[in-house]
Amino acid sequence: MLDAKYLRENLEEVEARLATRGSEVSLGRFRELDERRRALLTESESLKALKNSVSEAISKVKDKSQIQDKIAEMREVGVRIKGLDDELRGIEDELQMVLLTVPNVPHPTVPVGASEADNRQVRTWGEPPCFAFDPKPHWEIGEGLGILDFERGAKLTGARFTLYRGAGARLERALVNFMLDLHTERHNYLEMLPPFVVNRESMTGTGQLPKFEDDLFHLEGVDYFLIPTAEVPVTNIHRAEILKAADLPLSYTAYTPCFRKEAGSYGKDVRGLIRQHQFNKVELVKFVHPATSYDELEKLLSNAEEVLRQLGLAYRVVELCTGDMGFSAAKTYDIEVWLPGQETYREISSCSNFEDFQSRRASIRFREDEKSKPEFVHTLNGSGLAVGRTLVAILENYQQEDGSVVIPDVLRPYMGGLQKIG
């Protein structure tokens, strides 16, 4: 959520920067409500000052019969004050709802563009493998090895659900454990295991609500939601808290399943694991001092990249343009892994700096010292990594002509020493 004072003082600049996102964001309603709010506040405070002053004078008059008119007038003033305060509460509630639907302002360094075609490639790592045969897509490999069962997954639930079997299930579990070990032991993140169901306040705090409620799985009969990402519960761990500057940065990692309706994705990635309603992910979340948040973003990005480097998977890093960024982000990098079966790079992680956009919504603050005024922290997060897509990349990059798949060296201890599937 943007700061109302900053918005008021920089309205035209903010509108211009939000326009680069490609969404039609009009701040006219904010201006109307904000002006009405300030007018009501001024009138209410003026009447309260008058009422207090007159009431004090009345209290000093011994013969109240001489000032009955003034007493009656102050009763009317009290009624007027109540009416103003009631209207003010309604205006403030509506103003809050308007602010909750305004996206974050892109950082000045973010490239301006309309779509992913305008994203900027930052770097590449590794060389895509060369095969002496035509590489298969992961769904053919997985079905051929009997480790992915798309038909039974659909029977159990529906489209975009998959049953992992045998070595496929073990490989998924191995990836989760490998990622968590890497981030906790080498990168010094604290592991969390949060609830997979959260309340409305948590979804609002990270920016999923109120704007994207139709994209979420809502539980019937209770106002809870299945999480679309561990970002939601982990960021909200410190909702409505004041942290100590000396404790920053706080770095957390968590494995969770994620649940998404994937509204608007009809016809996209209809085969395989790329776009599922339920998938596993290891998330990285940071609470940082505003002065160091962009340095911390680069560190978080490097931590996510390290997973792919350890696995020997070629990838590239792209900086998202203004029109391709998520609602809450001020700056985002995507990591895209090479998939030979599709002959293209596909997103496997998004790493973002939200600045104080989420912390303002969730009231996550810090103090420099005991006497300092609380300030909003900056929040960052990124996938470290999407587990299913990492499994996809392993199947496609490590496939052999005979249909088998070689297990990357770093995963073999997690696979009981298994060197190859098939």
UniProtKB/Swiss-Prot annotation:
Query: How is the quaternary structure described?
Result: Homodimer. The tRNA molecule binds across the dimer.
- Which positions does UniProt annotate for L-serine binding? 229-231, 283, 383
Query: Which superkingdom?
Result: Bacteria
Instruction: List, alphabetically, the SUPFAM superfamilies matched.
Output: Class II aaRS and biotin synthetases, tRNA-binding arm
Q: Its Enzyme Commission number?
A: 6.1.1.11
Cystine bridges: none
Task: Please give the family membership noted in the entry.
Answer: Belongs to the class-II aminoacyl-tRNA synthetase family. Type-1 seryl-tRNA synthetase subfamily.
Q: Name one GO molecular function term.
A: ATP binding
Query: Where does it reside?
Result: Cytoplasm
* Record carries keyword Ligase: yes
Q: Which organism is it from?
A: Geobacter sulfurreducens (strain ATCC 51573 / DSM 12127 / PCA)
Any one GO CC term of this protein is: cytoplasm
Main localization of the protein? cytoplasm
- What keywords are assigned to this protein? Aminoacyl-tRNA synthetase, ATP-binding, Cytoplasm, Ligase, Nucleotide-binding, Protein biosynthesis
Which residues bind ATP per the record? 260-262, 347-350
Q: In which pathway does it act?
A: Aminoacyl-tRNA biosynthesis; selenocysteinyl-tRNA(Sec) biosynthesis; L-seryl-tRNA(Sec) from L-serine and tRNA(Sec): step 1/1
- Notes concerning its domains: Consists of two distinct domains, a catalytic core and a N-terminal extension that is involved in tRNA binding.
Per the record, the GO terms for biological process are: selenocysteine biosynthetic process; seryl-tRNA aminoacylation
Q: What lineage is this protein's organism placed in? A: Bacteria, Pseudomonadati, Thermodesulfobacteriota, Desulfuromonadia, Geobacterales
Q: What is this protein called?
A: Serine--tRNA ligase
